[in-house]
UniProtKB/Swiss-Prot annotation:
Protein name: Large ribosomal subunit protein uL24
Annotated function: One of two assembly initiator proteins, it binds directly to the 5'-end of the 23S rRNA, where it nucleates assembly of the 50S subunit.
Ion transport found in the keyword field: no
InterPro entries tied to this protein: KOW, Rib_uL2_dom2, Ribosomal_uL24, Ribosomal_uL24_CS, Ribosomal_uL24_KOW, Translation_prot_SH3-like_sf
Record's GO cellular component terms: ribonucleoprotein complex; ribosome
Gene responsible for this protein: rplX
Highest taxon of the lineage: Bacteria
Keywords: Ribonucleoprotein, Ribosomal protein, RNA-binding, rRNA-binding
Organism: Leptospira biflexa serovar Patoc (strain Patoc 1 / ATCC 23582 / Paris)
Record-stated family: Belongs to the universal ribosomal protein uL24 family.
Upper classification of the organism: Bacteria, Pseudomonadati, Spirochaetota, Spirochaetia, Leptospirales
Subunit relationships: Part of the 50S ribosomal subunit.
A Gene Ontology molecular function term of the record: structural constituent of ribosome
């Protein structure tokens, strides 16, 4: 008796090492929210998604409860795929020339004193 395997789309990646962490300042580089900056509220490593403060907000309708007796619509942040955001380095943007603004930088890992730390690439400055 052969069992039929169902295709469930892209399987979630477990225990993936992400370069974006909570409380980082990031810039959205693609999608309908392109160009917006915000602070990372949470990282969902299982689904490769990030929640960013003030970005990708949607309305949800809630029933009246004791905490919210009126009920109604509330706006909450929805996740964005981690490939659509880049780390934003405010220090580098302030030092840049006015014509050439540095919006986002790539992150990498480097060994310092036996520990793995996040650094900007290609400069190698520790974050």
């Amino acid at each position: 008796m052969a069992t039929k395997l169902a295709y469930r789309g892209s399987e979630p990646t477990k225990f993936k090492k992400t370069k974006i962490k909570k409380d980082d300042e990031v810039l959205v580089i693609s999608g309908k929210e392109k160009g917006k900056k915000g602070k990372v509220l949470a990282v969902d490593k299982r689904k490769d998604r990030v929640y960013i403060e003030g970005v990708n907000k949607r309305k949800r309708f809630v029933r009246p409860t004791q905490e919210n007796p009126g009920g109604g619509a509330i706006e909450i942040e929805f996740p964005i795929h981690i490939s659509n955001v880049m780390f934003h380095d405010a220090k580098a943007e302030n030092k840049a020339k006015p014509k050439k603004k540095i919006k986002a930088v790539r992150l990498g890992f480097a060994k310092k004193d036996g520990k793995s730390v996040r650094v900007t690439r290609p400069e190698g400055k520790e974050v």
